[in-house]
Amino acid sequence: MELKLKTISKDGIPEAISKVELYRYLNEPEEAESICHDILAADPDNQMALRLLGLTLTDQFEGRHPDRYAEAEKFFQSLTSPYDRLYYRGLLIERRAKAQVKAGVPAHNLVGSLHEAMRCFEEAEKIRPPHNDDAMLRWNRCVRLLEKLGNPPVEQSHTSLHDDDTAPIEIMRRPGGRAAK
């Protein structure tokens, strides 16, 4: 038997979208992801499928690398609406931070991410469609999460890198470097 993906019909896309939503509700993001890929194979610019695919990837975040962040970001950035691009970028950042909280990442490492998510939500709020308060709801969730974390200060690194800096391994390979002795 030949293993070859089958292409769904464009007429079947609305039902396939419903199945994606169902599998997300059932907490089966891999199933939802597979269907999103099938929809996009039939209609590569389908905005709902792009949104849902990005969301199914964020549903799989566990707070460790690799978490498919860049892949989800690519799908969200391909949305045509400026509002959607800002809103879903904020949601992407927020969901990654929440996954990292659950994975035990120190709170001070997440403050910057949550502030960046809030910046996205604030910009999205300015251009939101009428009667759409989603960006404000997400902003409020970030505020509550920061309050729960105690709003720790962002840890500042005193290390600065410059264009001419060399990786430590390269220094060790140079004559007179530690490895050369």
Spell out what each predicted region is.
Residues 1-14, 77, 108:
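TPR-adjacent "capping" and linker segments in tetratricopeptide-repeat scaffold/adaptor proteins
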Residues 1-7, 30-38, 69-73:
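Repeat-mediated protein-protein interaction surfaces in helical alpha-solenoids
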Residues 2-4, 126, 131-181:
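Terminal, low-structured helical/coil segments at or just beyond the last alpha-helical repeat
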Residues 10-15, 43-57, 81-103, 133-145:
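Amphipathic alpha-helical repeat scaffolds of TPR domains
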Residues 11-35, 103-104:
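Alpha-helical segment of the N-proximal tetratricopeptide repeat
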Residues 25-61:
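N-terminal interaction modules that seed assembly of large macromolecular complexes
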Residues 42, 78-79, 127:
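Structural marker of alpha-solenoid helical repeat scaffolds
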Residues 57-78, 88-123, 148-162:
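Short coil/linker segments at helix-helix boundaries
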